[in-house]
């Protein structure tokens, strides 16, 4: 499988951020985000982890009732990224 260029990875990251902005302040599971941007779940997770390192998204480790997630990951846009996106839109 050919490597994806940095430019294309950047465009996919923009799609993810756009989706998270639309549903903000809600968090979404990795599988739902992958479905929305029509990408593989593992690939989407790798992009989300890059965005987390850049402090653009935040990983949610607990469910609404306080239970810890062991297998799943939910993601939401960070507050700083949300404010920056809000100024653009």
Protein language model regions, located:
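Short, Lys/Arg-rich nucleic-acid/phosphate-binding segment
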Residues: 61-73
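Short, amphipathic alpha-helical interaction segments positioned at domain boundaries
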Residues: 73-89
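Long, compositionally biased intrinsically disordered regions
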Residues: 2-3, 36, 65, 89
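Short amphipathic alpha-helical interaction segments
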Residues: 38-53
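Short acidic, hydrophobic short linear motifs in intrinsically disordered regions
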Residues: 25-36
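A short, conserved structural fragment
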Residues: 52-64
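Short alpha-helical segments that sit at the start of domains
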Residues: 1-17
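Short, locally clustered residues in the helix-turn-helix/winged-helix DNA-binding domain
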Residues: 18-25
């Amino acid at each position: 499988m050919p490597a994806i260029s940095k430019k294309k990875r950047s465009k996919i990251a923009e799609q993810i951020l756009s989706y998270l902005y639309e549903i903000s302040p809600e968090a979404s599971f990795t599988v739902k985000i992958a479905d929305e941007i029509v990408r593989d779940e593992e690939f989407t997770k790798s992009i989300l982890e890059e965005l987390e390192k850049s402090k653009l998204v935040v990983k949610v480790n607990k469910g609404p009732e306080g239970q810890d997630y062991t297998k799943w990951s939910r993601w939401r846009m960070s507050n700083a990224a949300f404010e920056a996106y809000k100024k653009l839109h």
